Amino acid sequence: MNKKKKPFLGMPAPLGYVPGLGRGATGFTTRSDIGPARDANDPVDDRHAPPGKRTVGDQMKKNQAADDDDEDLNDTNYDEFNGYAGSLFSSGPYEKDDEEADAIYAALDKRMDERRKERREQREKEEIEKYRMERPKIQQQFSDLKRKLAEVTEEEWLSIPEVGDARNKRQRNPRYEKLTPVPDSFFAKHLQTGENHTSVDPRQTQFGGLNTPYPGGLNTPYPGGMTPGLMTPGTGELDMRKIGQARNTLMDMRLSQVSDSVSGQTVVDPKGYLTDLNSMIPTHGGDINDIKKARLLLKSVRETNPHHPPAWIASARLEEVTGKLQVARNLIMKGTEMCPKSEDVWLEAARLQPGDTAKAVVAQAVRHLPQSVRIYIRAAELETDIRAKKRVLRKALEHVPNSVRLWKAAVELEEPEDARIMLSRAVECCPTSVELWLALARLETYENARKVLNKARENIPTDRHIWITAAKLEEANGNTQMVEKIIDRAITSLRANGVEINREQWIQDAEECDRAGSVATCQAVMRAVIGIGIEEEDRKHTWMEDADSCVAHNALECARAIYAYALQVFPSKKSVWLRAAYFEKNHGTRESLEALLQRAVAHCPKAEVLWLMGAKSKWLAGDVPAARSILALAFQANPNSEEIWLAAVKLESENNEYERARRLLAKARSSAPTARVFMKSVKLEWVLGNITAAQELCEEALRHYEDFPKLWMMKGQIEEQGELMERAREAYNQGLKKCPHSTPLWLLLSRLEEKIGQLTRARAILEKSRLKNPKNPGLWLESVRLEYRAGLKNIANTLMAKALQECPNSGILWSEAVFLEARPQRKTKSVDALKKCEHDPHVLLAVAKLFWSERKITKAREWFHRTVKIDSDLGDAWAFFYKFELQHGTEEQQEEVRKRCENAEPRHGELWCAVSKDITNWQRKIGEILVLVAARIKNTF
C-alpha cells in the first residue's frame, strides 16, 4: 500500500461526521440543513445528500421549476411596450411558416452583422495591438534578459540552487529514520556466489600490486590481502572472473582442435560458431506459457496417437525454436522408431542431425523406405564429394529406375558424353518425360537428334515442345524450308490427338524461340497460331495488341511476323501500314523501313504520310534525289496535297535550293492555295531577308484568309522586327478583331505594350482577353508573369489563386505556382499539384526542377525521365533534362539525352518555340536547338 495515500480516501464519510471536529473546530447547523422532523424508525437519511437535494425547500424549488414551463400571463410580467417577457406561443406547434420567418430574421441578423465587419475586425485588431504594446506579456518583458542566458556557463548553471522553501522543512515535516538489520541469508548467498570486484584498477601491476602514483611513494611488490590482484587463499570465496577466463580458454582449445580435424569439417565452423549459437536463440515473441501449453498439447497427441508423423515433427520443431536442439533430436529419433514408414519424419531427422549423424539417419531411412526419391535426393545432398554423390544417385536409380527427378539429378553431375549415355537409358525407363527426350536430343548429333525426336513424338504425341524443338533443330542446321512444314504438321497432329491449341501458350513459345535466336521458328509459330480463336471483326485490334505485347517483351521478330501477317490480311489498311512503319523506324533498319514504305505506297497511294515518311528517310540518309523522286511520285498520286507540296518546299529549302522552293510555292499557291501554303511562302521570303516580298505576300494571304491568326502574327512580328511599333500594334488589333479567340495574338499584343513601357495597357489587354476567353490557362499565366516581372509579387500571387480557382486542372498553372511559393512551401505546393494533375508533363517537370534545386540528383533524374516519357513532344522538358545532365551527368548521359531528343523531334514548349521559331535559327537541327535552349536556361529556381 502506498504510504502517502490514506486508506479512507475516496470512501463515503461515516454517519454524523463533522469536518474538523477532531482538531477542535466546531460546526453549526441550521433548520434548513436538518429539515423537517422525521420518525426515528425511518431508515432514510438525507443529511449527507448532495447540495440541492437535502431539504424540503430544495424539493419545492425543483417542483416549482418543473411547473415554470407553462406561460406566466400575470399582469406583473406584462410590459406596455414589449408585451410579455416570454413568448405567448412557445407551447404551440412549430410550423413551416415559423421556420421561414426564423430563417428570414436569421438572414437579417447575419446581414447586419456582416456590415462594417471588416472595419470592426480591423478596429478590434488595432485595439488588441495597442493593448499589447501598453501591457506586454511577462514573456516579452524578459525576452532581452532571456537572450543573455546563452552566455551562462555550465558551471554557473550547476551552481544555481534548487527552488523551494528549505528554511525549516525538516522541522515542519519530520521523517523518522528506519533501520533494518541485514539478514544472514544475504551474507550466505553472496559468500557462495563469490561476489567480488570485476573491474581492474589501471594502476594494477602484473602480480596484483598497485603502482603508487606519487614520486615519493613505494611500488607495492606483492599483492595485499584482498587487493584486486591474486586473491589471498583461505578466504573461502571464488573468483568468478578467473573461472570465466578459464572457460573461454578451454572453448578456444576445443574449437582449435575441431578446426584442425578433417572429420569435423562439416560439423563445426569455428568462425561462425557464435553466429550459430545466436541463431539457436528463439526469435519468436510468444509467451513462455504458450510454449508450455503447446508442449503439453503435442505430448498429449503423441501419447494418444504415437504413429501420427506430424505430431513428432511439430514437437521437434517446437523444441528447436525454443533452443533445445538436443531435445528436438531425441524426439524426432523417437518419432522414426514409432513411424518408420514416414518419409517426412526421416527427412526432418536428417535435417536436425549434424553431418555424419545425418548420413547415418538417411542410411537407416533407406533401409525402411527403399523407394523414396526424396530420401535419396537428401542423401546425395549430404555428400560433399562428387563421386560420392554419383554413387548415391546410381544406387538410387537401381531401386527407383522410373524417377525423372533422380535421372535429372544424376545427369547434371555427369560429363556430356556420360550424360548422353545416361539419358539414353533414362528415356527407356521414363519414356513419357519430355524433358529427358529434349535433353537427349540436345546432346546428340543432327541425325541422331532427329531420330530421338521422332521416337519422342511416338511416345508423347500430345506435347507441343517436341515439335517446336524439331523445328529449331532444322533451323539450326539450315533447313529453314522444313520449319514451316513441321509447325503445320504439329498443329494438325496435336488436333488429331485431341489437344486444344492454346494461342497464348504458343505465342509464349514463339517469344522464347525469338529470345533463343530461332527467328524462322518463332515466325512460323506466329503465322500458324495468330488467327486461332479470334473473331473476324476483332482480328485487327487483337493483332495490334499482340504486336505491342511482343515489343514490350523484347520479342521483335515475333512482332515483325505479326505485322507481316496482318498486312497480308489487310493490305489496304493505312493504319496497319503506319504501325508497321513506326515499328521498323524504332526497332528496324533504314533499309527495312524503306522497303516496307515502298510496299505501303503501292497498296495505299493516297496515304500522304507514307509518302512523306519515305521521302524523309531518304533525305535523312543524304539521298536528296531519291527523296525528290518519291515526292514526285507522291504528286502524281496526290496532285493537290498540301502536305506533299510543303514537304517538297522544305526539302528544297533545307538543301539551300531557294529558287526551286520559290517556284514550288508559286505552283502550290496556284494549284492548292491554302493558308499554310501562303504562310510558308511568307516565312521563306522573311527568313531570306526579302521583307518587302514577305509583306506583299502576307497582305495577299490576308485578303484570302483573314481568319487565319498565324498570318496576323507574322505581319505584326515583321513590323515589330523593323521597330515599327504602331504598325505592329495595329496588325495585332486587326487580327484580334478577326480572331478574338487566338491566345498567341493576345500574348503578342500584351508583350508589345509591356516592351514599350505601357504596363497598364498590357494589363488591360490581358483582362480583356480573359473576359473573351474564359478558363484559358495561357492568358492567366501571362497575367501572373506580367505582375511578377513588374515587381508586384502580392498581386501576382492573388492572380495565381484566382487562376487556379478558374482552371483547377491546368498543369502549366500549377507548375508556375510551385515556384511562386517560398522555398519551404514549395514541396507542399508540388504535392497539391500532383494531386490535381498527376500525369501532366508541366507538373512532372516542376517536380524534377524542385528536386534539382534541392540537389537530390537521383530523384531529379528519375522525374525527368518520367516527364519525357509521358510527353516526348515537350521541348522544354528535353532542354531542362539536357541542362541537368550537363551539370550533374556524364558525357554518355548527355549524349543519350541528346539522341533521344533528336528521335522524339519535339515541336512544343514555351522556351523551345521561342528558339526554334526565331528567324535566325530557321535552318538549325533538333540537336542544335536543344543546345541553344539549354544555354538560355538559368537554374535560379
From Swiss-Prot:
Phosphorylated by PRP4K during spliceosome assembly. This is Pre-mRNA-processing factor 6. It comes from the Eukaryota. InterPro entries: HAT (IPR003107), PRP1_N (IPR010491), Syf1-like (IPR045075), TPR-like_helical_dom_sf (IPR011990), TPR_rpt (IPR019734). Residues 66-78 have a biased composition (Acidic residues). GO terms for molecular function: identical protein binding; protein-macromolecule adaptor activity; ribonucleoprotein complex binding; RNA binding. It is found in: Nucleus, Nucleoplasm; Nucleus speckle. Residues 39-65 have a biased composition (Basic and acidic residues). GO terms for biological process: mRNA splicing, via spliceosome; positive regulation of transcription by RNA polymerase II; RNA localization; spliceosomal tri-snRNP complex assembly. The modification Phosphothreonine is found at residues 180, 266, 275. GO terms for cellular component: catalytic step 2 spliceosome; nuclear speck; nucleus; U2-type precatalytic spliceosome; U4/U6 x U5 tri-snRNP complex; U5 snRNP.
